[in-house]
């Protein structure tokens, strides 16, 4: 309501034990400005965004958050208008001039309000094709058919890779055609996710395992 009704006022971070930092500038300058080296956390997400279809302003910087959900997103959502109109029916307003905002609201609506788990949400926003569903076991196929019919307006189309942060974990997801790259790596009890492997190796050069998830395949990592 603040974002929608009070001109010039925005809430960018409102979670418990979670913080969101937004800015326009070079990553090293942003980190120094917010003194990020003084913070500790079990999960960190970040995105250096170069806006191509929307205004470049600090409100459009990632992550986007609502309560304890945060989203960073690389790509372009061609289904944005359909997704936005559906979410507006349930009181969500997109005010920050970028398509990523609606993804955050979709997760809040499906997980917190509809009580769906993250794997089910992944099968809604990156739904399998009908031809794939037809080849599945009857019980699973019936469930996915229901999701595709009930939440058809929440299918996200276009190239994307996203990372969801939430209390106790993170989830990474590609579009179902894998039109955007995404790489996952592990070393001991640490998991790294990035658009490119070189970004991971810049932080941890000697990772033990590296792989690229399939399109529409969620990677869910939670605290022990």
Predicted features and spans:
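Conserved short alpha-helical segments that host acidic/polar catalytic motifs at enzyme active sites
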Residues: 1-224
């Amino acid at each position: 309501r603040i974002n929608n009704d009070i001109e010039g006022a925005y809430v960018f971070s409102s979670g418990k034990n979670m913080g969101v930092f937004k800015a326009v500038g070079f990553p090293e300058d942003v980190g120094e400005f917010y003194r990020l080296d003084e913070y500790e956390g079990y999960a960190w997400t970040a995105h250096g965004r170069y806006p191509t279809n929307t205004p470049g302003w600090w409100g459009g910087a990632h992550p986007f958050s609502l309560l304890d959900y945060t989203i960073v997103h690389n790509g372009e959502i061609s289904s944005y208008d359909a997704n936005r109109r559906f979410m507006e029916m349930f009181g969500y307003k997109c005010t920050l001039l970028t398509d990523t905002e609606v993804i955050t609201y979709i997760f809040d609506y499906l997980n917190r309000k509809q009580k769906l788990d993250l794997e089910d949400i992944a099968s809604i926003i990156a739904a399998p094709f009908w031809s794939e569903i037809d080849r599945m076991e009857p019980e699973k196929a019936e469930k996915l058919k229901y999701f595709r019919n009930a939440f058809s307006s929440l299918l996200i189309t276009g190239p994307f890779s996203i990372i969801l942060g939430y209390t106790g974990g993170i989830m990474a997801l590609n579009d179902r055609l894998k039109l955007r790259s995404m790489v996952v790596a592990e070393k001991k009890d640490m998991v790294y996710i990035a658009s490119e492997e070189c970004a991971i190796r810049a932080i941890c050069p000697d990772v033990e395992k590296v792989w690229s998830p399939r399109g529409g395949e969620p990677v869910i990592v939670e605290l022990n």
